[in-house]
């Protein structure tokens, strides 16, 4: 289940190996030289977090979100990234030796500063800046309605730092659902969602639940 509150970390030279940090909202955490080897960070948010000179050896990051994160000189050797977003992330001196990437998106992130970063082009999308996305008026209205929900507003998963609709989030949603379904689903979510969450994956999970139960 998603954590209901921010689980902000402040570790310095700590040992936190083989831990389960699934669904943790780690926004604005500040960690230095901490060993997280073998830990599970699936569905975790690193929004505005600083994890400098940390060790993430063989950690998993499924549907994790690194937004404006500072990962300077951290090690992600043999880490597994799947359905993960890196937006405006500091990768200066970050070591990705042996890391695996599948369906990963990099936006406004300087990859040239990272070390040993290797991936197949089919598994990664790279955008130098936030892309423009043309959507229908009906979908735009549904997204704006959803963003009026206090928990969606707090999560920041549908908007940019300027408060505009996040084209990457919309792109991901349209990869998972047809537009007509997405419009109706977002309208339902705007009324139904009543808990804290921290990544887009939670909205996708709710929409898939509606789909499975034939509610739309």
What are these regions (language model features)?
Residues 1-145:
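Tandem repeat scaffolds
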Residues 122-216:
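Terminal module of membrane-associated proteins
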């Amino acid at each position: 289940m998603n954590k209901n509150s921010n689980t902000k970390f402040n570790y310095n030279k700590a040992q936190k190996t083989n831990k389960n940090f699934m669904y943790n909202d780690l926004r604005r955490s500040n960690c230095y030289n901490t060993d997280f080897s073998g830990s599970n960070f699936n569905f975790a948010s690193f929004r505005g977090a600083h994890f400098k000179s940390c060790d993430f050896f063989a950690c998993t990051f499924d549907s994790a979100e690194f937004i404006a994160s500072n990962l300077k000189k951290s090690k992600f050797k043999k880490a597994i990234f799947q359905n993960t977003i890196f937006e405006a992330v500091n990768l200066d001196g970050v070591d990705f030796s042996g890391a695996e990437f599948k369906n990963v998106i990099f936006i406004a992130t300087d990859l040239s500063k990272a070390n040993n970063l290797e991936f197949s082009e089919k598994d990664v999308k790279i955008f130098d800046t936030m892309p423009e996305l043309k959507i229908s008026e009906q979908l735009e209205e549904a997204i704006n309605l959803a963003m009026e929900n206090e928990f969606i507003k707090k999560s920041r998963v549908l908007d940019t730092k300027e408060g505009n609709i996040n084209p990457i989030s919309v792109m991901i949603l349209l990869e998972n659902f047809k537009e007509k379904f997405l419009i109706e689903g977002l309208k339902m979510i705007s009324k139904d969602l009543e808990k804290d969450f921290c990544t887009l994956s939670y909205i996708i999970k709710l929409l898939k639940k509606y789909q499975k139960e034939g509610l739309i």
